Amino acid sequence: MATFKLVISDTKTGVAKQIEITGAEADKLIGLRIGDEIEAKELGFNLSEIFGSEIPGDVKLKITGGTDKDGFPMRPDVHGPRRVKILISRGPGFRPQERGERRKKTVRGNTISPEIAQINVKIVYP
């Protein structure tokens, strides 16, 4: 059984809320990738209660990223649920200090697995 911290961002208001999910709801997320969408109802959420404002019931949640249990960020260009060291010049997991700087960094792949601790999602309105 997996346990995830789910950070849900509302792009209209700019508010983000963090909730913890376990059990069957968390297992529905395993195997999904960054960029995939899932119905909020499928996870058993009432987003109007969580955010305290009126949010329609037919919204989807789009996975935008996350981190694993050791804090390594997920990258959309690394496929699979694995952790790898890659040479990167920009993007998630690296902020260059100089122009043209590249470094070898450890990152996590784009697929959700039980080793993921936090999943970032945003609300996609119909």
UniProtKB/Swiss-Prot annotation:
Q: Identify the SMART domains for this entry.
A: Ribosomal_S6e
Respond yes or no to whether keyword Transmembrane is given for this record.
Answer: no
Gene Ontology BP, a term: translation
Which superkingdom, per the lineage?
Archaea
Q: Which residues form a coiled coil?
A: none
Record keywords, A-Z: Ribonucleoprotein, Ribosomal protein
Ribosomal protein among the record's keywords? yes
Q: NCBIfam families recorded for this chain? A: PRK04290.1-2, PRK04290.1-3
Family to which this protein belongs: Belongs to the eukaryotic ribosomal protein eS6 family.
Tell me the protein's name. Small ribosomal subunit protein eS6
In its UniProt entry, the species of origin is given as Thermococcus sibiricus (strain DSM 12597 / MM 739)
Lineage of the species this protein comes from: Archaea, Methanobacteriati, Methanobacteriota, Thermococci, Thermococcales
Q: Which gene encodes it?
A: rps6e
